[in-house]
C-alpha cells in the first residue's frame, strides 16, 4: 500500500497550516511623494486611469489612493464629467 493512506488527516492539516502566511506588500498612494502628479480636472489621461471600463470611479482599496486624495480625485472626475471632458458612462 502507499504511505499517503496511512497518514492521519489531522496531522496532514497541521502540516498544511504550518506554512508561512501569504504576505501582500502594501501599495503606496500614487499621488504621494515628491514626483507625484497633481490631480487636475483638465488632465483627462490621468483621471481616466482611475475609471473602470464602465466609466465608474474605481475604489481606493483597488487603486491604493489615500482617502484624502481619493476625495480630490472624485471631485476632479466629477468636474471633468460636468465640463464634458470625461463621459458619465461608457458603452
Swiss-Prot record:
Keywords on record: Ribonucleoprotein, Ribosomal protein, RNA-binding, rRNA-binding
GO biological process: translation
InterPro entries: Ribosomal_bS18, Ribosomal_bS18_CS, Ribosomal_bS18_sf
Entry's Gene Ontology cellular component terms: cytosolic small ribosomal subunit
Example of a GO MF term: structural constituent of ribosome
Domain of life: Bacteria
Family to which this protein belongs: Belongs to the bacterial ribosomal protein bS18 family.
Function: Binds as a heterodimer with protein bS6 to the central domain of the 16S rRNA, where it helps stabilize the platform of the 30S subunit.
Known partners and oligomeric status: Part of the 30S ribosomal subunit. Forms a tight heterodimer with protein bS6.
Name of this protein: Small ribosomal subunit protein bS18
Gene: rpsR
Amino acid at each position: 500500500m502507499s504511505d499517503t493512506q496511512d497518514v492521519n488527516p489531522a496531522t496532514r492539516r497541521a502540516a498544511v497550516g504550518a506554512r508561512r502566511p501569504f504576505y501582500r506588500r502594501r501599495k503606496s498612494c500614487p499621488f504621494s511623494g515628491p514626483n507625484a502628479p497633481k490631480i487636475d480636472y483638465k488632465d483627462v489621461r490621468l483621471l481616466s486611469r482611475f475609471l473602470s471600463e464602465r466609466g465608474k470611479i474605481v475604489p481606493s482599496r483597488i487603486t491604493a489612493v489615500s482617502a484624502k486624495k481619493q476625495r480630490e480625485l472624485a471631485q476632479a472626475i466629477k468636474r471633468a464629467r460636468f465640463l464634458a471632458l470625461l463621459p458619465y458612462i461608457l458603452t
